[in-house]
């Protein structure tokens, strides 16, 4: 049986479990498997790119909502500039004043990314990042991981059922 959709995956899990008393918990087993895969999987299919326009004088912009881990931050200028990550403490120590210029470093504070020196002109930043797994549901029947690695979903969900 192919389990290429959430519905088919639930059916396959019910068949493997062969226990009617666990059927109502199958969505929970899938959710628990997704939580673990989100922490541990690092596949090419999870890589994404996002751009952000940095206005003159704007230090912070929102991060993508599906971001799990940043791989690279760059300023799309000529020449291209790859930025270095700094802890928030080091970020403010390195550039203690609000002077403007071309960003050299970035930091993460909550759901935002900050740039120092603060841009003195409008720039475009590109963030290459690993995304969280989009959760399966009755309204989201498939995702990249289920399409490319259905066995990971089956194994992960079954292992949660047997814990």
Please report, for each region that a protein language model flagged, where it lies by residue.
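Glycine-enriched, solvent-exposed interface loops adjoining structured elements
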Residues: 1-163
